[in-house]
């Protein structure tokens, strides 16, 4: 059974879904909250090195603000909805290299995410 760990960041939340040694981070919160994110993880006993994938549910400011800092620290790929990946690649939002559109490989994860974040995840 997956473990769901909320990572509260004030008015924005992120979540870590873990099963076995792998963990997926759902969303990255507001900008300039990287230190708070890593401090909160540490207090909850979570090693950020366990994060193997970051999934962005949608590219609103409060969901991608810390993405670069978290991704650089975790050194993992980022998945975004396919319909928003091209928009990001055109430079509308500064986004780290390694962003990949969400594809069929994540459909199973999408089913799990739709239970964790109902109303936001659409695959």
Indicate where each model-derived feature is located:
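Active-site-proximal flexible loops/turns
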Residues: 15, 34, 65, 88-91
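Conserved beta-strand hairpin/beta-sheet module of binuclear metal-dependent hydrolase folds
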Residues: 1-44
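Glycine-centered loop/turn positions within well-structured domains
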Residues: 15, 24, 62, 85-86
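Short, acidic/turn-prone active-site loops that include or flank metal/cofactor-
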Residues: 30, 83-86
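Active-site metal-binding motif and surrounding structural segment of the metallo-beta-lactamase
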Residues: 35-80, 84
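Metallo-beta-lactamase
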Residues: 85-123
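Short, low-complexity, polar/charged sequence segments that are solvent-exposed and flexible
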Residues: 24-27, 43-46, 75, 97-100
